[in-house]
From Swiss-Prot:
The keyword Transcription does not apply. Bradykinin-potentiating peptide 11a-F is present only in female snakes. Transmembrane segments: none annotated. The modification Pyrrolidone carboxylic acid is found at residues 1, 4. It is found in: Secreted. The keyword Secreted applies. This peptide both inhibits the activity of the angiotensin-converting enzyme (ACE) and enhances the action of bradykinin by inhibiting the peptidases that inactivate it. It acts as an indirect hypotensive agent. Bradykinin-potentiating peptide 11a-F has much lower activity than BPP-11a. This is Bradykinin-potentiating peptide 14a.
Length: 14
């Protein structure tokens, strides 16, 4: 798979 979920997502500011 291309994306492995769940995975730790970085906190990106809006």
């Amino acid at each position: 798979q291309w994306a492995q979920w769940p995975r730790p997502t970085p906190q990106i500011p809006p």
